[in-house]
Every structure is written in structure tokens, then in C-alpha cells.
Amino acid sequence: MKDTTSLFITDSLDSLNPKKDTSILMMEEISNQEGKVFQCEMKDLRYFEQIVQANIVEIKDPISTPRVFTPIDQSLPLKDFNYVFMRKDPPVDDDFMNALHLLSQAELEGANVINRPAALQKFNEKILALRFSAWMPDTKVICKEDDLKNFKDRHSTIILKPLNGMGGELIYKFEELTSKNFEIFKSLTNNFQTMVMVQNFLPEIYEGDYRVLIIHGEPFPIALARFPQGDSFKANLAAGGKGQSREINSVQRKVGKEVGKLLMQEGVVFAGIDMIGDYLTEINITSPTGAREILVQSKQNPIQQLLQSL
């Protein structure tokens, strides 16, 4: 990455935790390799003078808090950077989609955008996993109350989650369908209009929810196993779970390779799959995380491998 320029489109800099954030680790690695690092938010993108541009800052010291940055006096074309990393966290709302449309235009102008905007536009992360339904727990995408009842009749405990959530937000476990739980379902579906996902609950979650990073189509050999704490059933780090680095097993490797084939076809060079036991639950392609924790605990660096593959 020496003598290269990289632009990161992220959430606000002050919201990124240097000790945990994968985007900061990516900036750090590029900076260590004598590349130049720049950053902007989605709101800084614009189409002006017949080209996609961004108002940016240069990141001088990615790991410092607060991070040392220098504003750039002019708006620069995205095509002038060697790499443009789209690293904005969900939700995938209208602003997110409009930014992707601009990034697709920037691609046409010559920008090298990672991951490809077309793939981020095309796939919902939870629905994308349905392409590998043979590896998934029993899963339905529904919005009607009768479908919820029918699904609950098949399983003693079920999980309900929105299609555009992240970090364990708005995920519920139903052991029975109480009036309160019906109200939760009604709320999440916007009065039975918006699709949600239901799955049978996997008790293997207490043995770890594994984040397996997929880099250039190949599973990284070390995963981050996340464990629920206390009475919680949520293993996401953002929801209070604790992570441990673990070597991936043969099933995780097999699923990772299968998913990796599709991702490479779609221009997704960096992704994360989530697996509970032998089951695939999600494919994260927007801004996969977990790399910092893997590096700190195992001393193996997935981001170094990613940058070498570009």
C-alpha cells in the first residue's frame, strides 16, 4: 500500500472506537505501509461538475484519540484515490442507498470501490444468507400474524429479528406467544406490512456465535467466537457479548468457501459470515467487524491479508 491513497466512507470519526473498530485498523495498516489515508461521511459525497466528489479529511494518526486529521480545502474526485472503502454501518436506509448510487456512478468514472456498490445495493444481508438455506436453521421471512403462529407451532423457542438491523438490535426470543409478544411482532412489522425474519432458536449460541471473515473469497483461519453474558441470549459484542478468537472448524471452512465463491462473483472482497453451531445465520457485506479482536487475541492479522489481496 506504499504511496497509495485510500478514502474511507465511515460513520463520524468520534463514533469509531480505535480499540475495536475494524475501519480504524484498516486505516492503521495502510498508514503503517506508508499509504495516505483520507476519510469522509456519506453526507460529504456529492455529484458536481459532472463527477462524483467528496469533501474529505486526511487522517495523520488513525489510532490516536482524538484522531489527528487535516481538512482538505477542496472537494476531490473519488476516481483520484487508489481505493475507496465503503465502511458505513447499517441501517441500510434511503441515505445509504443514495450514497451507493453515487458510488456506482463513481465506479463508472474509474473509482475502485470496496465492496462493490452494486452488491451492497443488490443484497440484504439476512436475505442473502437464504441462498445457502441448506446450511441455515429453519427460517421464514414473514409479516403476517398467522405465519408467526404457524412457525411457533413448529418450534418451542423462536427468534424474531428485523431485516435491516445490526449489533443485536431489536432481536427477540419468544418461548411463547403472549399478548406482549404479539405487540412486539406488530410493531416490528409496522402493523403487519414490513417483512421480518423468524428462525428456530439455536441453544448452540451459548457455545459461541462465530464471526468468520471472508477475504477475497477465502475464510480467514481464525474466527471471533462471541458469547452471551448473564441471562442474555445475544452474543453480539455491541449487545454485551464477549469475544474469543478461535480456529475455524471444518464446517465453518466449508461454508465460508461456498459463500466466498458467490461473494467474489459479486465483487465483495471483504465480508463476514455468522455461524451458530453448524448453522449459517447471516452474511455481513456492508462493514464487517471483528478483525481488531482477532488480531489482539491471536496475533494474526486479517486486514493485512485483505490489503495484500487487493
Q: How should these model regions be labeled?
A:
Residues F8, F85-M86, Q199:
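Redox-cofactor binding/interface segments in oxidoreductases and associated redox assembly factors
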Residues D14-V141:
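Conserved N-proximal alpha/beta basic substrate-recognition cap immediately N-terminal to
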Residues D146, H155-S156, E169-R253, L263:
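Phosphate-binding site of ATP-dependent enzymes
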Residues P117-Q121, R226-P228, I276-Y279:
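Short glycine-enriched loops at secondary-structure junctions
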Residues A134-S156:
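Rossmann-like NAD(P)H-binding beta-loop-alpha module
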Residues T4, T10, L16-K19, Q244-L310:
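ATP-dependent carboxylate activation and anion-phosphoryl transfer catalytic cores
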Residues S12, K88-P91, L163-G165, P288:
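Short glycine-rich anion-binding loops that position phosphate/pyrophosphate groups of nucleotides
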